[in-house]
Amino acid sequence: MDKGIILLAAGGTGGHLFPAEALAHELKASGYSVHLVTDSRAERFAGRFPADEIHVVASATIGSKNPVKLARSAWKLWTGLRAARRLISRLKPMAVVGFGGYPTVPPLLAATGMGVPTIIHEQNAVMGRANKMLASRVAAIAGGFLPEGTGAFAAKTVATGNPVRPAVLEAARVPYAPAGGDAPFHLVVFGGSQGAQFFSKAVPQAVCRLDDALRRRLKVTQQARPEDREGVIASYEKLDIPAEVSPFFTDMAGRIASAQLVICRSGASTVSEVSVIGRPAILVPYPYALDHDQAANAAALAAKGGARVIAQVELSAERLANILTDAMSNPDTLAQMAAGARQTGKAGAARLLALLVEAIASGSTVAKFKETRS
């Protein structure tokens, strides 16, 4: 039985789309039709997204002080708003759910103006610019790492956690396998949607400094930008280290599950997936992130002992080599970190968010929803 349409809106990066994808699976399983509004960047993720239809609506980043660029952005947003109104009038969704990024602004503004129930999900510990614009207008705010009981919008904020995709939940079934002695050691390195250029230089340089006995144990899976890929491959070939290097892995969850150690950025989706799967991590927050949201995300995992957090400016090749040497020599410590990471993970986040969406779509309030969950 089709319960109606839920319209999801997300920016076209993995950090926005992955939690939207997880919610879409839950809503589809509950009998809803799901449509997605996004931008052209989402094309590489579209094959896995369980939407009945994907719509591209014009939007633009608002940040430039250049009057010409500002005028262009305003025109794009106005065009997107008109298109979003037409789309909502045609689909008649029961609710519109935004996951951040400027492509969510036109459909969420249109929905609030048309009286359609609205929810935003903020993945990070610090609210992003698009969600800040929308927070006062929407009926409910779901938080990945947002604190539930503080802030101007505490009354309508629910700490759902960050929904993770079915592939991540499947990978979470794989227990962590410590690798001591001469056992092979799988290192997984990735940089998220902001790219992995820093890791493309830092990690091979660090691996080069390892003792021969440690290098012989090492196997590497590493995300690298297309322009860096050949150089990274050559670095590992020179060291005779088996390595898979690619700009994008469709099966990243499974690769994380097979890792003894992960080195990565600390975007919200990344931290959530690593913690649900339960793998020890070296987190290097993206230093140019607005509001330092990645540092705040990383702190949540480090507080449970699931990760070490190191600022990029402090992570020299020599220091990273020392960290890798220590990690590969102390499997029990990594096992404890894996357990700490798993304690942080919220595997039921997608289901909880789906329940919140259903409640708001049916006309209920956040206060009533919280009462039913207490």
Swiss-Prot record:
It holds the Pfam family Glyco_transf_28. This is UDP-N-acetylglucosamine--N-acetylmuramyl-(pentapeptide) pyrophosphoryl-undecaprenol N-acetylglucosamine transferase. One of its GO terms (biological process) is cell division. HAMAP family: MurG (MF_00033). Keywords: Cell cycle, Cell division, Cell inner membrane, Cell membrane, Cell shape, Cell wall biogenesis/degradation, Glycosyltransferase, Membrane, Peptidoglycan synthesis, Transferase. GO terms for molecular function: UDP-N-acetyl-D-glucosamine:N-acetylmuramoyl-L-alanyl-D-glutamyl-meso-2,6-diaminopimelyl-D-alanyl-D-alanine-diphosphoundecaprenol 4-beta-N-acetylglucosaminlytransferase activity; undecaprenyldiphospho-muramoylpentapeptide beta-N-acetylglucosaminyltransferase activity. Its EC number is 2.4.1.227. It is found in: Cell inner membrane.
